A protein has these predicted regions:
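A short pre-motif secondary-structure segment
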Residues: 115-119
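DNA-recognition helix of helix-turn-helix
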Residues: 66, 70, 133-156
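C-terminal flanking helix
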Residues: 17, 21, 41, 109, ...
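Residues within helix-turn-helix
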Residues: 31, 127, 138
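Acidic, proline/glycine-rich intrinsically disordered inter-domain spacer in sigma factors
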Residues: 3-7, 11, 79-106
Length: 156
């Protein structure tokens, strides 16, 4: 598979925006998903002129989204969390989760949370999870496994 010039950014955004938002709603929560979404696509826009489309742009944008989500969690952990402003538009949760499960997912370490969300919410294969996390497939499997174990212990 050769590389080619990627589609215009607007089309790229419309093709992948919903997938990224779905991922971020679970990865960082509804209250922060819009902000992290904007940060993700600003980073992508800056890098986009240098990107070659090898058929894996979906993995590329999810890698940016996962790193932006991890950065978000680091910022939150460093200092007091400001009270989020309600979004101007409603953020649609991909699937309703009960509060206990949502809290348990939010409490997972960032890489485990991202791995579990990609595997069990977005149904992504382990090789893609590894690529998004910048790890090996074995490490991706280990993050999913450890995350699920923690969820079972917390939720019961």
């Amino acid at each position: 598979m050769g590389t080619r010039t990627p589609p215009p950014f607007e089309r790229f955004l419309s093709e992948h925006g919903a997938t990224v938002m779905r991922f971020l709603v679970v990865a960082v929560g509804s209250a922060h998903a819009d902000d992290v979404y904007q940060e993700t696509f600003l980073s992508a826009l800056r890098a986009y002129p240098k990107v070659r489309d090898d058929g894996r742009l979906d993995r590329w944008i999810l890698r940016i989204a996962s790193r932006t989500a991890i950065d978000h969690h680091r910022r939150v952990a460093k200092g007091p969390t400001p009270t989020p402003m309600p979004p101007d538009r409603a953020v649609h949760d991909p699937e309703p989760l009960d509060d206990g499960l949502r809290d348990a997912v939010a409490a997972l370490p960032a890489k485990q949370r991202i791995a579990v969300v990609l595997r069990h919410v977005m149904d992504r294969p382990y090789d893609e999870i590894a690529e998004v996390l910048g790890s090996t497939e074995g490490a991706a499997r280990a993050n999913v496994s450890a995350g699920l174990k923690s969820l079972r212990e917390r939720v019961g």
